[in-house]
Amino acid sequence: NQKRLALKEENYPRCIVRECCCMNPYKMVIAVANQKGGCAKTTTAVNLAAALAKGSKKQGLPPSKVLLIDLDPQGNCATSFGVEKKKVKKTAYDLLANESGEDLPLMDEYLIPPKQLTESMQEAWSMRNGGKKAPTNLSVGNLWLLPSDIHLSGAEIELSHKIGRETRLREALAPIIDNFDHIIIDTPPSLGLLSINAMCAANWVMVPVQAEYYALEGFSMLMNSIKMIQRRINRNLKIFGIAMTMVDARSKLSRHVCDQVNSKMPKKLFKTTIRRLVKVAEAPWSGAPTVLLNKPTNSGAGAGSLEYWTLAKEYHHRVLAMRREFGVNEQPRLLLERKNRM
């Protein structure tokens, strides 16, 4: 079975995905991917999704409707919002490995809505702070989550013999893609069938790269894998941006890795870098992403929050520039709503 799951070109016929549900390049379906673990994929996906959904006038970021999809069997996206895994009834595993019939079930049945995410964050914060009332900033009104759990690790084997196994997520997204401004997919630290599903459903890839030596080798391997997926599975897939994470400005090695990535893909590298900060790592324990938990400041507990807010703003500006390039001045969801009112 492991051989069948290996990502080899001969396993996938050319242009297996001829029509993607997100053919339009201005639709933001973005896979946060890197086959190397420990590069802050989940932290980046969670904080980016939360910042885009929350919005901030001070940061110059309007609120957006966001869907966060967790395709990592560790299920840390739910934990980041204080959701107890034992209380989650339906997950990405139930959606992708559904056996009830040929058609996939409606995806919205599997999503945790904003109200439940807000309640989970506030309950988790209160429980870990001696029963105190949670601060009002621990709320998010525009974010939906498709959670995962450890059962998802078996989905690759279960799906390996199924026709269209690479397109399960794409098919599930098709009916709801226009309901959201951004769909962000967190992927596992490997390039198996789950990551392939993410990159088949997406039209963009965002790559967090850890500012350490081994990251350079992993980065080159990932670029080759993305090129193969573009040729064989999803020709609409493009690299949206590369974010340097775990950066230590005092380290010569960190600066060297950042310079090397910049020399390879200068137009794709985000100007914002994410430092290795304890408060960012501690935030999930409090049951909320750092962008919601900590007020953005230049130092102290809010430094990591400021960096992720800045990254979200840079992401937003890239999206606006891309949409202007394609002659689109509004978010796709707003265009659809205007059309429906006419």
Kindly label every feature range from the protein language model:
Residues 2-342:
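P-loop NTP-binding core
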